[in-house]
């Protein structure tokens, strides 16, 4: 019965998430703050009404409490390494990059929409629930399935090669995002930072030059490989919230 409630809540919140983003046309986080707050609010409401949890319990359940510094630090280091790779790409391919017009106005919305909203739903609500019953790898694997399915929509908006690579990325990325969730003390902030950089970078940077068209696939590869460094940290270092 709990599984049916879990799936119902997931579908309900995600449907609202997608519908709101489509109606508002928030492809680059233009209305991301509003969408993020809406998703967080409805996810908490789902925990309250579907699982009979209090507001305080639900707030904690979906990972919105104060994070452990370790997880956030690791997420930041991984993101810095990923961003440095862009300079390497530019140097090797003789490409150049510019910022999307008014990019700085998009950053907060991208963080709320790609980072906070998605991680509250998929890591806080979904993975957090499943992790109570299964080992890390099994819980991460199960929770990866819906995360992958919702990204299939990319086949309608992206070239096949990039969409296919993006689906593979969602498979791989599910695991380091889940690990960062635990490293951060079962909170969404560390994976939200990584998720924000993964999605936000290609929405605020514009590549130009002969090799510009290869940058999306390069970035997908970087986002699939570098976050796996999180698994080099001994498992005993993972701190549960106190």
Predicted regions and their residues:
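Aromatic-anchored segments of alpha-helical transmembrane domains
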Residues: 11-20, 80-88, 144-153, 195-205
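Membrane-interface helix caps and helix-loop-helix hairpins in membrane proteins
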Residues: 25-27, 90-98, 154-161, 206-214
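Juxtamembrane helix-entry segments on the extracytoplasmic side of multipass membrane proteins
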Residues: 96-108, 156-169
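Alpha-helical transmembrane segments in multi-pass membrane proteins
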Residues: 2-52, 105-106, 216-223
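Interfacial transmembrane-helix boundary/kink motif in multi-pass membrane proteins
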Residues: 1-11, 32-40, 54-84, 99-102, ...
């Amino acid at each position: 019965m709990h599984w049916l409630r879990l799936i119902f809540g997931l579908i309900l919140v995600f449907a609202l998430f997608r519908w709101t983003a489509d109606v508002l046309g928030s492809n680059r986080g233009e209305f991301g703050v509003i969408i993020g707050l809406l998703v967080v609010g409805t996810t908490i409401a789902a925990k309250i009404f579907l699982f009979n949890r209090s507001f305080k319990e639900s707030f904690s359940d979906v990972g919105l409490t104060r994070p452990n510094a370790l997880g956030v630090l690791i997420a930041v280091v991984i993101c810095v390494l990923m961003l440095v790779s862009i300079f390497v790409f530019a140097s090797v391919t003789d490409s150049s990059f510019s910022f999307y017009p008014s990019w700085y106005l998009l950053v907060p919305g991208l963080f709320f929409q790609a980072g906070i909203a998605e991680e509250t739903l998929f890591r806080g609500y979904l993975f957090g629930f499943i992790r109570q019953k299964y080992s890390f790898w099994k819980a991460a694997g199960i929770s990866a399935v819906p995360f992958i399915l919702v990204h299939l929509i990319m086949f309608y908006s992206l070239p096949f090669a990039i969409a296919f690579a993006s689906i593979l990325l969602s498979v791989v990325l599910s695991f380091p995002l889940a690990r960062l969730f635990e490293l951060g003390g079962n909170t969404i902030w560390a994976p939200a930072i990584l998720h924000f950089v993964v999605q936000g970078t290609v929405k605020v940077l514009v590549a130009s030059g002969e090799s510009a068209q290869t940058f999306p696939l390069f970035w997908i590869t970087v986002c699939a490989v570098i976050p796996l460094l999180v698994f080099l940290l001994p498992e005993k270092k993972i701190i549960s919230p106190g």
